[in-house]
Design a protein with these regions (language model features):
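Short amphipathic alpha-helical "interface-anchor" segments enriched in bulky aromatics
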Residues: 235-243
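Active-site-proximal inter-transmembrane loops
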Residues: 145-150, 209-235
């Protein structure tokens, strides 16, 4: 075996947490249930803890700190810091730094901490079980987080905080309820194991199972079932191309409770500056991917010159739409700059600017609609192509 094939030694602490605790849960939780039983109080509190831990990871660690998708009030930050520590997935600083590295180097088997290219098991939890990385942390990509007092306080007190949230709080709850062991097993142990693997599904299954409507440049996939399990994180293909959007599920019907929580917090002053990617950019990504697939599919087939020509005409039209949108954005930015510089202070100029901005808005909406219609035409074109191929077979 050469040096490159030698695996690093096991990380004993992580082995105890990510292997030892699930084994303990598989044995102890059913045994206590058989001989003593659990009541509704314990199950409900286990679900409450699971929800608070999970949403603090998705809404706090992930969308707030890793991606800066919105701003949060100090109260909301402290809430996420405490309950996120209860998820036992490391401090905000370490978690967010790793996640930023994952996005920057996605699918790179050397630089991506949990690259899907190294397999389902590795991306799920294998990357944590061995000492694959140096013991010297690199937070060069998280200097903004190092200036956040909430992040740094949690990082410095993480061990005490996570111990209290995972053991101390369930014990106190058990004392109040009158069954310490049963409460610790459900609210502490089982809840923690479930919470771990729900999060790990995003690193693993969401890179192997699902669709890629927005980009095929990486392995991330959209999966509605995983979104249901992971508080809305399952729309992963969208997230990897538009990571600063506070939403993962962008349609009203897509299950994304994290998005709804952030939006609700913004209504009561706990969150602000929610980032939303424009509909035009979303449509552009979908069409760009669809055109790429259509070209590849038609290139493999012989004949169909008329359909291929239609496809190229549609693509040229798509390019024209993109150029128009780029020009409109440049014009919009220039007008905004002029307004901020005080160049349009007179009432007449303000009225003129309002009219021009309304006209720009109309043009943007027209372009968005044009892309939407082009998606339908492209779909019909591919249906024609598929029918033609079926007849030729």
């Amino acid at each position: 075996m050469n040096q490159a094939q030698i695996k690093p030694p096991f990380n004993r602490v992580n082995m105890a947490i990510f292997v030892g605790l699930p084994i303990a849960a598989l044995i102890l939780v059913p045994l206590w249930g058989i001989y003593q039983g659990y009541d509704t109080f314990q199950w409900l509190w286990a679900l409450v803890f699971l929800y608070l831990n999970g949403m603090s990871i998705t809404g706090g660690y992930h969308r707030l700190w890793a991606h800066r998708a919105y701003n949060a009030s100090p109260a909301l930050k402290w809430f996420f810091a405490f309950w996120g520590a209860g998820a036992l997935q490391n401090s905000i600083l370490i978690w967010a730094s790793d996640h930023r590295r994952h996005h920057r180097h996605v699918d790179d088997n050397i630089k991506d901490p949990y690259s899907a290219g190294r397999g389902l098991w590795y991306s799920h939890m294998g990357w944590m079980l061995r000492q694959y990385r140096s013991n010297t942390p690199d937070f060069s990509n998280a200097k903004d987080l190092q200036r956040d007092p909430v992040v740094m306080w949690q990082h410095e007190h993480y061990v005490v905080l996570t111990t209290f949230m995972n053991l101390g709080l369930p014990v106190l709850l058990g004392l109040w309820h009158g069954d310490i062991i049963g409460t610790v097993l459900l609210v502490g142990l089982l809840r923690l194991v479930v919470n771990h693997h729900v999060t790990f599904f995003i690193n693993s299954l969401a890179h192997f199972w699902g669709k890629r409507p927005y980009t095929e440049s990486n392995s991330a996939r959209d999966n509605g079932f995983l979104a249901f399990l992971t508080y809305g994180e399952g729309y992963h293909n969208y997230h990897h191309i538009f990571q600063t959007d506070y939403r993962n599920g962008i349609r009203w019907w897509q299950w994304d409770p994290t998005k709804w929580m952030i939006a609700a917090c913004s209504k009561v002053g706990l969150a602000s500056d929610l980032n939303r990617v424009s509909n035009f950019k979303i449509q552009r990504a979908i069409l760009d991917t669809a055109f790429s697939r259509a070209r590849d599919k038609m290139a493999e087939a012989e004949g169909n010159d008329s359909l291929k020509n239609m496809l190229e005409r549609e693509y040229q039209l798509f390019t024209d739409f993109i150029n128009q949108w780029t020009a409109l954005r440049a014009e919009s930015y220039e007008r905004t700059r002029e307004q901020l510089s005080g160049a349009l202070e007179e009432k007449k100029h303000r009225l003129q600017t309002k009219w021009e901005n309304a006209a720009l808005h109309t043009q943007f909406k027209t372009l968005e609609y044009s892309l939407k219609m082009q998606r339908k035409r492209l779909g019909l074109l591919m249906e024609q192509f598929n029918c033609h191929q079926a007849q030729m077979a």
